[in-house]
Amino acid sequence: MRWGRRDDRDTGKILRNRSRNRFNIYHYVSTVKKVKETERELLRLTQTWKAIRLISYNSVGISINRLTSRLIHKLHELLNGLIS
């Protein structure tokens, strides 16, 4: 039986395939949204990192190590969110 035929025997199959395709499209779109959100977040973190480096070059007394570890932690959270 071909996929596109509409008779009583494979109507259920066609409906199941359409449902699965709809799910796949939804899953793809939500994954793309996650990727775009992650890209935006990474851009923001990169800008934050550049600001931290500028501050450290200007010898302002803040704990660069603490900020760096927070940045790495945030990046780790983002990547875990993207994978799951």
From Swiss-Prot:
InterPro entries: C-84-like (IPR020272). It holds the Pfam family DUF5494. This protein may be involved in virus assembly. This is Uncharacterized protein C-84. It comes from Sulfolobus spindle-shape virus 1 (SSV1).
